[in-house]
Structures are given as C-alpha cells and as structure tokens.
Curated annotation (Swiss-Prot):
Location of the S4 RNA-binding domain: 43-105
HAMAP family in UniProt: Ribosomal_eS4 (MF_00485)
Listed name of the protein: Small ribosomal subunit protein eS4
Gene Ontology CC terms: cytosolic small ribosomal subunit
Single Gene Ontology MF annotation: structural constituent of ribosome
Cross-referenced InterPro entries: Rib_uL2_dom2 (IPR014722), Ribosomal_eS4 (IPR000876), Ribosomal_eS4_central_region (IPR013845), Ribosomal_eS4_central_sf (IPR038237), Ribosomal_eS4_KOW (IPR041982), Ribosomal_eS4_N (IPR013843), Ribosomal_eS4_N_CS (IPR018199), S4_RNA-bd (IPR002942)
Family the entry assigns: Belongs to the eukaryotic ribosomal protein eS4 family.
SMART domains (alphabetical): S4
SUPFAM superfamilies with a match to the protein in the record: Alpha-L RNA-binding motif (SSF55174)
Sorted UniProt keywords: Ribonucleoprotein, Ribosomal protein, RNA-binding, rRNA-binding
Top-level taxon in the UniProt lineage: Archaea
Gene name of the encoded protein: rps4e
C-alpha cells in the first residue's frame, strides 16, 4: 500500500549531520515540523533547549519549558517542540537574558553563538528570489522560507543574493547589503563552511552551471565557493558578530 502523507518519524542515524546529538544513544529523533528552514539547515527547538542549552534532562521537561513560553525565536514565543531553528535565527531566553544566533561551525555543525541584546533585535535575510504579486507589490522570498513585500518602485533596490537586515520581530528593513565585489560574506555550506572574508571575484558559467565566488579571508588566503553558499553580512566589515 502506498504511503499517505509526509513522513512523521526520523531515525537518529539518518538525522542531518549538522545536528549535535548522540546518534547511538536512542533509536529515534525528533523530525522538524514543516516550516521556515529545510531539515538540513535547521534543528528542532527541543534539542536547543535540552541538548544545546542543557535546561532540561528529558524531552518532557523541555516541552514543559516551551509550553510556558520561555523560549523566543526571532523575538516570538515558540511552543512547538518540533519548530525548525536554522541559520541566522535568534534564540532568546528572557528570564536569563541570554541571546544566541544559530550558525554553522567549521565542521558543518549548527552551534549557538552568544550575542548581545542589541544584536538580538537584528536578523540578516538572504534574498533567494523575488516575484510580482497583486497590489503592485514585489515579494522577496528569503533564505528561511519566509517572504517580505516591498513596493514596485523599490524593486531595483532588492536583487537576488542581496541581504536585507531586519528588526525582529517587527520585520522592518533597516539595511540592504548588495552582493558585489568587496562585500563581506559568511559561507553557510560546502567544504569551506563557516569561513568568512571579502568577495574578490564572481565568475559566471554557461549551460546552467552555478556561479562561483572567490573570497579572500582575514589571512589573505583565497578560496572558492558556490554563490548560493555565500551570505553577505556586511560591506567592509560584518554587521553581526561571528564565532
């Protein structure tokens, strides 16, 4: 008989390698709910509370903390223990005054990078693409699965691969960072994940091959990565703190 509906289970051995979990301790893992990020680039909120922050010893304790509304993601209370928390998301715990940004490390694992309360009010969004919608609006489709509407007159200010920095949870754009030579980028995937530096060159290829970006890191070393892996986070210097 054919399977009906999406999968609702996940074995730990098959979980994304970006998760910091014990793969052989138990058989099953929590499968993220459909939401802002893909499963590969996010982790269920319950693991943030229990395994990363250590605020609970069991899943039951972690779910109780979430149900009490003590954990905020991008400034909003999230109670769904399966909620996917991904790259550039801000996790806040008001009771303790802690704030973290989710970023990958050099081995591709998702980590919680401590940030200040002021920085927790800002979140960078990468523009994956854009499209026209009713009402003379342009819809910006962002890296975390969300979207943002801008007026038709502003459409040329927002291009694919640009980054918009928004206030959260209000989602008001405060700065636009163009994808261009000299821009400061952070690599989110690939063998050079978590490396950072300035764009030196953008090479385009025919026949549908992906664009390649050459980046110069802080030590003057050059390396290449795919354009889709390069996340602009500043012009001359990063607008957010990094590990």
């Amino acid at each position: 008989m054919a399977r009906k509906g999406p999968k609702r289970h996940l074995k730990r051995l098959a979980a994304p390698t970006s998760w910091y979990i014990h793969r052989k301790a138990y058989k099953w893992a929590v499968r993220p709910s459909p939401g802002p990020h893909s499963m590969k680039t996010s982790i269920p909120l319950i693991y943030i509370v229990r395994d990363y922050l250590g605020y609970a010893k069991t899943a039951r304790e972690a779910r109780k903390i979430l149900n009490e509304g003590k954990i905020l993601v991008d400034g909003r209370v999230r109670k769904d223990y399966k909620f996917p928390v991904g790259i550039m998301d801000v996790v806040s715990i008001p009771e303790t005054g802690e704030h973290y940004r989710v970023l990958p490390n050099r081995i591709g694992k998702l980590i919680l990078h401590p940030i200040s309360e002021e920085e927790a009010k800002l979140k960078p969004f990468r523009i994956n693409n854009k499209r026209m919608v009713k009402g003379a609006k342009v819809q910006l489709n962002l890296h975390d699965g969300s979207n943002h509407l801008v007026s038709l007159a502003e459409k040329d200010a927002y291009k694919t691969s640009y980054t918009v920095i928004m206030q959260v949870p209000e989602r008001q754009i405060v700065k636009v960072l163009p994808f261009e030579v000299g821009a400061y980028v952070f690599v989110t995937q690939g063998k050079n994940v978590a490396r950072k530096g300035k764009i030196v060159e953008v090479r385009q290829f025919p026949m549908g091959w992906p664009d390649v970006v050459t980046i110069e890191d802080e030590n003057g070393e050059l390396f290449d990565t795919l354009k889709e892996y390069a996340f602009v986070i500043g012009k001359d210097k990063p607008e957010i703190s990094l590990p």
